[in-house]
Amino acid sequence: MEKTRKDVCVPRHVAIIMDGNNRWAKKRLLPGVAGHKAGVDAVRAVIEVCAEAGVEVLTLFAFSSENWQRPADEVSALMELFLVALRREVRKLDENGIRLRIIGDRTRFHPELQAAMREAEAATAGNTRFLLQVAANYGGQWDIVQAAQRLAREVQGGHLAADDISAELLQGCLVTGDQPLPDLCIRTGGEHRISNFLLWQLAYAELYFSDLFWPDFKHAAMRAALADFSKRQRRFGKTSEQVEAEARPSC
């Protein structure tokens, strides 16, 4: 964390579970994909607010490893929307100094979509103002397993002793290993769970739940979440008195 203007404490890394697209559409008697399309506007709004506030990293849970279980026509529509959004939004991201990273297991995606992911990442690779991470075919359990497998290969190859494996080493092998841990995790749609998202990384994150469906979570809602975060005291196992005595930011 760091102090920003007017001594408002802003999270370095915000993670969001974008929930409620289907229910938003159903409420309006629209097909589910209409909710996902409307959700793109909310993504734009949240990026704007976070970048303006001084957030460094925004990670969005776009498609979980469990979402493949949804109806085939819905999954197909989501993949098409993802492809279109990547190609349409990459120029604007680049113009605004935003770097895009896709995290998750890409092997199950169509080669055309995988290529679009690589192209979008390459087009924005030099940007440093803000990092947008999109979690696609991602699961927190998968992330921990692939990190453990990387360490196991190091041990098997004689490059690492098993007793030298630490929490820090494992964390560094996660797909977000080179980024600060999330300070704030937001979930929209009224549900109160993290649904296999960034399981390791969210260990000390502040959780914020909104009843708004994702397409309705825009500028004002994002600012409200950041304002709520700035009022919290993050203790990391210490007492309030210890935190206050250290005279560090209360978030």
UniProtKB/Swiss-Prot annotation:
- Under the GO molecular function aspect, what terms does this record hold? ditrans,polycis-undecaprenyl-diphosphate synthase [(2E,6E)-farnesyl-diphosphate specific] activity; magnesium ion binding
Q: Name one GO cellular component term.
A: cytosol
List positions binding Mg(2+): 19, 206
Could you tell me the keywords of this UniProt record?
Answer: Cell shape, Cell wall biogenesis/degradation, Magnesium, Metal-binding, Peptidoglycan synthesis, Transferase
EC assignment: the record states: 2.5.1.31
Which GO BP terms, alphabetically?
cell wall organization; peptidoglycan biosynthetic process; polyprenol biosynthetic process; regulation of cell shape
Q: Which CDD domains does this UniProt record tie to the protein?
A: Cis_IPPS (cd00475)
Reaction(s) the record says it catalyses: 8 isopentenyl diphosphate + (2E,6E)-farnesyl diphosphate = di-trans,octa-cis-undecaprenyl diphosphate + 8 diphosphate
Record-linked InterPro entries = UPP_synth-like (IPR001441), UPP_synth-like_CS (IPR018520), UPP_synth-like_sf (IPR036424)
Cofactor stoichiometry and binding remark? Binds 2 magnesium ions per subunit.
Q: Which amino acids does the record list as binding substrate?
A: 20-24, 36, 64-66, 68, 70, 187, 193-195
Catalytic center at which residues? 19, 67 (proton acceptor)
Which prosthetic group or cofactor does it need?
Mg(2+)
Broad class of enzyme this protein falls into: transferase
Report the family membership.
Belongs to the UPP synthase family.
Q: Which HAMAP family match?
A: ISPT (MF_01139)
Q: What does this protein do?
A: Catalyzes the sequential condensation of isopentenyl diphosphate (IPP) with (2E,6E)-farnesyl diphosphate (E,E-FPP) to yield (2Z,6Z,10Z,14Z,18Z,22Z,26Z,30Z,34E,38E)-undecaprenyl diphosphate (di-trans,octa-cis-UPP). UPP is the precursor of glycosyl carrier lipid in the biosynthesis of bacterial cell wall polysaccharide components such as peptidoglycan and lipopolysaccharide.
Q: How does it assemble?
A: Homodimer.
Name recorded for this polypeptide:
Ditrans,polycis-undecaprenyl-diphosphate synthase ((2E,6E)-farnesyl-diphosphate specific)
Per the UniProt entry, what species is this protein from, by scientific name?
Pseudomonas aeruginosa (strain ATCC 15692 / DSM 22644 / CIP 104116 / JCM 14847 / LMG 12228 / 1C / PRS 101 / PAO1)
Per UniProt, what is the name of the gene that codes for the protein in this document?
Answer: uppS
